Regions:
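Conserved nucleotidyltransferase catalytic core and NTase-mimicking acidic/glycine-rich helix/loop elements
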Residues: 146-277
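Metal-dependent nucleotidyltransferase catalytic core
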Residues: 1-22, 30-42, 49-111
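Flexible, active-site-adjacent loop/turn segments at secondary-structure boundaries
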Residues: 41, 125-127, 216
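Short amphipathic alpha-helical segments, especially helix-boundary/capping motifs
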Residues: 10-13, 63, 141-147, 230-231
Length: 277
C-alpha cells in the first residue's frame, strides 16, 4: 500500500504542476492505471502524455522532471520514425517509474478527427488536465485491445528458416566451449520462439487474442501447457544444461511452427530443419 500511496502522491504533484504551467494544455494518463483489465498492482508505472504547445522545448530541459520528486535516473528517448514524440522514462525515489510522452496539440487533435483513437487510447485513457476542452471532441475509450494479424506464408517460412539458421550455430559454439556466443544465439532464438508462440495463439483461437508486447502476460494468452514447456527452454551457464535447454527450445519451436502451418494450410520447411537441427 505504501508504494501505491507514493505513486498517487507523485501523480497528484504532476497534475498540480500541469494545471499551473501555461505551456501544458492537457495531461492524459494511459497504461494499466487507465485501463479496466484488472492488471494494476503495486509495481504499475505511471504513463503520462503531456500535451504541450512546445513539447520540443520541454524535451531540451529536464528541470521540470525534478519538480515531482527525487530523481534516480532518466532514460531519454527522442522522436524517431516509429515514435512520433520524445519520451522521458523516469525512476523516482521509492521505485516509482513514470513514462512521460511529450506531445504537441496535434496528438489529441488527430484523435478528435474521424481518424479516432489510437490503439493506446482505445485501451483506456483519463484526461487529468484539460484546458482546451479536448474531452468534448475525443471519442470515449472502448477498452478494446488491438487485433494482431497473422503473417503471410512468405514471412512465416522466412522466419522459420531464420530460427533454424540460428539454431545451427549453438551446438558448434557449445562444442568449442564458447558459452557466451551460444547464449547470444539462444537469445535470438528466444525472440523467434516468442513470435511463433504469438502466431500459434492467434492461429488456434477463432476470437481475437490480447497479445502483449515482449511476452507480457504470456502465461494467460499462450496457455498453461506452453508456459510449462517454455520454462524448460532456459538453461544455466554451462554446456550440459545449455544443450538440454537447446533441445527443449528447438522441440517447442518445431511443434508450434508445424501446428501453425497445419492450421493455416501452409507448407513447413522440413528439409531445412533436418539439415540444420
Amino acid at each position: 500500500m505504501e508504494a501505491e500511496s507514493q505513486r498517487s502522491q507523485l501523480a497528484a504533484r504532476i497534475r498540480t504542476w500541469a494545471h499551473g504551467n501555461d505551456n501544458v494544455r492537457a495531461l492524459v494518463q494511459t497504461g494499466s492505471l487507465a485501463r479496466r483489465d484488472g492488471l494494476v498492482d503495486a509495481f504499475s508505472d505511471l504513463d503520462m502524455d503531456i500535451i504541450a504547445q512546445d513539447p520540443v522545448g520541454m524535451a531540451k530541459n529536464d528541470d521540470w522532471i525534478h519538480r515531482f520528486g527525487e530523481v534516480i535516473t532518466i532514460l531519454h528517448l527522442d522522436a524517431v520514425d516509429a515514435q512520433s514524440w520524445p519520451t522521458r522514462l523516469v525512476i523516482y525515489a521509492g521505485g516509482i517509474k513514470v513514462d512521460f510522452t511529450l506531445a504537441g496539440l496535434a496528438r489529441l487533435q488527430k484523435m478528435a478527427s474521424p481518424a479516432g483513437l489510437d490503439p493506446l487510447y482505445e485501451r483506456g485513457y483519463q484526461l487529468l488536465v484539460d484546458k482546451d476542452a479536448f474531452a468534448k471532441a475525443l471519442p470515449a475509450a472502448t477498452y478494446r485491445f488491438p487485433v494482431h494479424a497473422m503473417p503471410d506464408e512468405q514471412r512465416f517460412l522466412a522466419r522459420v528458416e531464420e530460427f533454424w539458421f540460428e539454431a545451427f550455430h549453438v551446438p558448434r559454439y557449445l562444442a568449442r566451449d564458447e558459452l557466451l556466443l551460444a547464449k547470444q544465439r539462444d537469445g535470438t532464438m528466444k525472440e523467434l520462439l516468442l513470435e511463433m508462440i504469438e502466431w500459434h495463439a492467434i492461429a488456434r483461437h477463432p476470437e481475437p487474442v490480447d497479445i502483449w508486447h515482449l511476452g507480457k502476460g504470456i502465461r494467460h494468452w499462450a496457455g498453461e501447457a506452453i508456459w510449462a514447456e517454455l520454462q524448460a527452454t532456459y538453461g544455466h551457464f554451462d554446456a550440459s544444461d545449455a544443450r538440454r535447454a537447446y533441445q527443449a527450445t528447438t522441440a517447442l519451436y518445431a511443434r508450434l511452427a508445424r501446428e501453425v502451418a497445419r492450421i493455416q494450410g501452409w507448407p513447413y520447411p522440413e528439409s531445412v530443419e533436418r539439415a540444420l537441427r
